[in-house]
Amino acid sequence: MKPWFNLAPTFVLLTLFAAQESSAPAPVPVEQEPHHHLLLKNDYLLVMRVVLQPGERSLYHVHSVDDVAVWLGNSSATQQLPNEPESAPAEQKPGNISLRTLREAPLTHRVHNVGQGLFDVLDVELLQRPEHPSTAVAGPVAGENPSARVYKWTLAPGSVTPMHTHERPYLIIAVTGFQLKMTAPDGQSFTHEIKPGDFHWVSTKVTHTLANAGNGEGQIIEIELK
């Protein structure tokens, strides 16, 4: 029999590897990732603002439902899947959108801000997928997944969208700050001073126009449930 002390190096290495393995952080649900700041939760969706300072990384986290991401700032970021190398940087600018279909195949990843600016994104997690999706559209569709459609309006000062109707609940998001004027078919109107990242959830049928009553270009995103 070999002396017991000949096994010590192997035992130490196995113990070290086991400790390293057990100390590796497990992925967390997206709403528990500390850079994802929860702003709204209801039966239909979660709205989170994701903020990473230059050089910061998120934790590994899991997206398990369809989602929409809306960029609010200029950024350069990578993503990394577990046990995979970091991706090449992706450049983004305000108003860019990303729609993913994840209910059948959840995504686990982490994000690394490799740019000089703030990584600033609204992440909208769509909690329900309709059994009978609406076929009515409110305007030109900028993107869609099985849970929602996205409309993007870029408004020069004084410009107005066509009158359009949201048959389904929707989320309206300000990409840029400007004076937004909303007008109903009866002529009743409301003007709001909005800031980048402001949003409003609407659960009733709405018909309106959107107008830029300010002096600079405005961008609005509408995420309408199907």
Give the ranges of each region predicted by the language model.
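Ligand-binding loop in jelly-roll beta-barrel domains
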Residues: 103-127, 204-226
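Bacterial Sec-dependent signal peptides at the C-terminal "C-region" and cleavage site
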Residues: 12-29
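Short beta-strand His + acidic residue motifs that chelate non-heme Fe in jelly-roll/DSBH
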Residues: 58-60, 78-79, 100, 106-114, ...
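Bacterial N-terminal signal peptides that target proteins for export
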Residues: 1-9
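Short acidic-glycine-tyrosine-enriched beta hairpin
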Residues: 83-103, 188-204
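A short glycine-rich, His/Asp/Glu-containing loop-to-beta-strand
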Residues: 33-59, 64-69, 135-163, 169-172, ...
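Surface-exposed beta-loop interaction hotspot
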Residues: 108-156
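Glycine- and acidic-residue-biased ligand/ion/polar-headgroup-sensing regions
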Residues: 64-83, 167-186
